[in-house]
């Protein structure tokens, strides 16, 4: 329960299942004969199915490995992982890069879901329309420094572009 990251490059283990990716490095174990610890694959399956239903995932049950999933489905796996582990902060680094419009909308809905369930979401991106749609507050960086912070509801694309490109005197 801490910080989770949803990467732009869909950083998942391609040859593993959806459940194995969600639990990667934190696999539940059970004791065989009361002694030998083994991964509890049944629990992983059950909890993964419940989690995917909870996020209204479009991931087909027949998908054996994440390599068979679309970009949006893969991002849903990363976001589901953050939800399952009850992250307090989720850093989303351009989570909709290279996604189709429908997939992008589903990822945006999941980002909102994270926030509604109490996670602080840091949403990094270049698509200002998307940023203004998702964010409560917007911070603009120029040359590695934060040059402007404002409420998203008070912001306009044109104003943010000036800060992003250094054409606003405060960013110079």
Regions found by a protein language model. Name each.
Residues 1-172:
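Glycine-rich phosphate-binding loops of nucleotide-dependent enzymes
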């Amino acid at each position: 329960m801490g910080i989770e990251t949803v990467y732009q490059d869909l950083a998942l283990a391609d040859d593993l299942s959806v459940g194995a990716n969600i639990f990667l490095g934190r696999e539940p174990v059970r004791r065989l004969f009361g002694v030998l610890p083994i991964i509890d694959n049944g629990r992983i399956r059950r909890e993964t199915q419940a989690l995917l239903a909870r996020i209204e995932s479009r991931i087909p049950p027949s998908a054996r490995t994440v390599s068979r999933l679309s970009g949006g489905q893969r991002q849903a796996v990363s976001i589901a992982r953050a939800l399952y582990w009850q992250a307090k902060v989720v850093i989303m680094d351009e989570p909709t890069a290279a996604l189709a419009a429908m997939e992008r909308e589903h990822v945006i809905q999941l980002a909102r879901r994270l926030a509604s369930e109490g996670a602080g979401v840091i949403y990094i991106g270049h698509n200002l329309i998307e940023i203004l749609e998702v964010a409560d507050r917007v911070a603009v960086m120029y040359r590695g420094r934060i040059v402007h912070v404002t409420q998203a509801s008070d912001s306009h694309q044109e104003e943010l572009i000036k800060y992003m490109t250094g054409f606003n005197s405060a960013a110079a």
